[in-house]
């Protein structure tokens, strides 16, 4: 179930006194910004399929996670390594079954936030170029395509495909280059304060989105970097662009 602020069912753009004067492009994170995914079934079904305990599976996935995120390992290679490290023969059929189940569960449990498509459509109608900039492993491009995001984005810069992950400067710069814009012409939105800081350090106007609403502020505001706007909906991000 998605958590949104009161009244978020209707897409209304707030008015801000000041807009980003030169904003021409939008860089948007994927997970917990435009979409969410319930990974509970991953934790229940994949360890059982692998013949491991939940603890063994989680430890293994955490170990391979950074390499998956920058494309140094495929899911098949990573899962084979988890099996091997736990004394299980990485039989190709078992590895393929794990990869297929992981993909199936990602596609089945990924959900857009209600304001995601209206936000992307509104930006396109205003001629604002869009890049999805996500730290992710293989499967996310297919998920974004299935959910209708790929059709509305001008480009998708995925860490597993470009070999760099937020908050490294390279991934933001790759998105800027693909959209043909300078950092000063961009607005970036992400839920993670560290990733917001990485963008802000390049001169990109940045917003941290708190999907649980104003009540989340007390727990997270301390981690919001200086100069980063806190927002609770994508409508607020749209309002950061000049009318």
Segments and roles (model prediction):
Residues 1-28, 117, 121-124, 133, ...:
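Asp-based, Mg2+/Mn2+-dependent phosphohydrolase catalytic module
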Residues 2-118, 125-126:
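N-terminal helical cap/lid subdomain that shapes the substrate entry/recognition surface
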Residues 128-130:
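Short beta-strand/loop segments at the ligand-binding rim of alpha/beta enzyme cores
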């Amino acid at each position: 179930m998605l958590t949104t602020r009161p009244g978020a069912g209707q897409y209304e753009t707030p008015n801000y006194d000041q807009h980003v004067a030169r904003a021409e492009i939008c860089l948007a994170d994927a997970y917990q910004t435009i979409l969410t995914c319930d990974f509970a079934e991953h934790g229940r079904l994949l360890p059982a399929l692998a013949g491991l305990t939940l603890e063994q599976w989680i430890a293994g996935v955490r170990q391979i996670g950074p390499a998956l995120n920058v494309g140094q390992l495929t899911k098949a290679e990573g899962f084979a390594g988890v099996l091997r490290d736990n004394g299980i023969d990485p039989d190709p059929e078992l590895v393929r079954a794990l990869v297929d189940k992981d993909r199936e569960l990602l596609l089945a449990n990924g959900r857009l936030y209600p304001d995601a498509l209206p936000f992307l459509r509104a930006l396109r109608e205003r001629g604002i170029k869009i890049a999805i900039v996500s730290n992710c492993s293989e499967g996310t491009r297919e998920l974004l395509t299935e959910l209708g995001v790929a059709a509305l984005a001008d480009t998708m810069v995925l860490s597993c495909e470009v070999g760099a992950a937020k908050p490294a400067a390279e991934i933001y710069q790759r998105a800027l280059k693909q959209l043909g814009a300078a950092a000063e012409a961009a607005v970036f939105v992400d839920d993670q304060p560290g990733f917001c800081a990485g963008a802000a350090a390049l001169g990109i106007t940045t917003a941290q989105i708190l999907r649980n609403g104003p009540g989340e502020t007390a727990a997270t505001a301390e981690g919001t970097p200086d100069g980063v706007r806190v927002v609770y909906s994508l409508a607020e991000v749209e309002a950061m662009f000049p009318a």
